[in-house]
C-alpha cells in the first residue's frame, strides 16, 4: 500500500507488522536440555569425542570398559511431557536401531554414563552401518542439536561409519559456522594424519572459515595452497577468496580475481557479484560499483532490482543525482519494477545536492506513471521538507504542478 506524491508529505507514521515465529516442541526439547549448555572447558574435556580427533590420541582400555558399563535401559518410564512429545516426533522412516538411539539421546542423563559411553553401547548392541550413522546425523542437524558434533566426531573413528574426506569437510563447515577456528584446524590435522587427501574442496572450506573469522592472511595463504595443487580452480574457491577480500576491506583484490576468472571463462555466482557491488555501493565508490554492475551483465547474469538498487545507492551516496536518476530509468526500461527503496535513493541523491526542483519533477513523473510512494520514500521527503520548513508549500506546489501537467495544450 502506498500514496501518491501529492499526499506523501502527510504520511510518515506507518508501522511495521509484527512477525511471530513458531517453534516445534521436538526442536525445543534439545535446546532446553541443560545438558546441552556447555562451557568452553567442558566442551573440550567432558567428552572424549572431541579429544579423540587429536593427533596420536588412542582410546584406552579403561575407557572402553567404562563404555561397557553404560546403563542401556529401555525408555518409557518416568518421562517428562516434553520427552514424551519429542519421542513421538522421531521420524518413523528411521530404522529401528536409529530410533532406539534417538530415544536414548532425548532421555539422556549423566547418571547413566557419559554421552560417548552411550554411543559405544549403541555401537555394540545395534551394529550400525554407515546409513544408520548418516540418518542420526541428519536428524540431529535438522534439530540444530549440539549432540550433532559429538556424534559426528565419534563416528569418524568407527569402522562401521566408513569415513571419507567429505565427512571431515562437513565437520570443518560446522565449525566454520560457529567461528571455531581451532577446532576446524584440529579436524584438518586429524584428517591429514589419517591419510586422507586434502583436496580443493577441503581447502576451500578452510578459506571460508578463515574469511568469516577475520583471519584474512590465513585465508590468502590457504588459497595459495589450493593453487599449488596444480588443479584448475573452480568458482567456489575463487568465490571464497573474493568474499575474504571483501571482508578484509580490499574489494579491489576481489575484483582482480573476478577478472582472472573471466579470463578462464569461469563465472562467479550472483551472490559474489552482489557482495562486491554492495561493498563498493556502501562506500560510495560509484566507479567501482559501475564496473561490477557491467561485469554482471557481461557474465550473462540478468540484474534484478537488488543489484540495480545497489548501483543507484552508489550514485546516491557519492552525490551523483543525475546518474542515480539515469540508473533508475534504465532499470524501469529493462522491465524491472521500481521499489520504494529505489525511489527513496533517488530522492536522497537530490537532497544531497539540494536539487529541489529536480526532485519535484521526479515526483510528478512518478505520479504520471501511477507509481505510489511508500514509507521509505515518504520519510526522505519528510526529513528534507521539514529541514527546509516548506511542508505545506511543497504539497500545494505539487498539486498545482500536477494539475498543470494534466491540462491539454
Curated annotation (Swiss-Prot):
Record bears the keyword Glycoprotein: no
Stated name of the protein: Pentatricopeptide repeat-containing protein At1g01970
Keywords, in A-Z order: Repeat
Species whose genome carries this gene: Arabidopsis thaliana
InterPro entries membership: Pentatricopeptide_rpt (IPR002885), TPR-like_helical_dom_sf (IPR011990)
Highest classification ranks of the organism: Eukaryota, Viridiplantae, Streptophyta, Embryophyta, Tracheophyta
Ranges: PPR repeats: 164-198, 199-233, 234-268, 269-303, 304-338, 339-373
Regions crossing the membrane: none
This protein's record includes keyword Repeat: yes
PANTHER family linked: OS07G0661900 PROTEIN
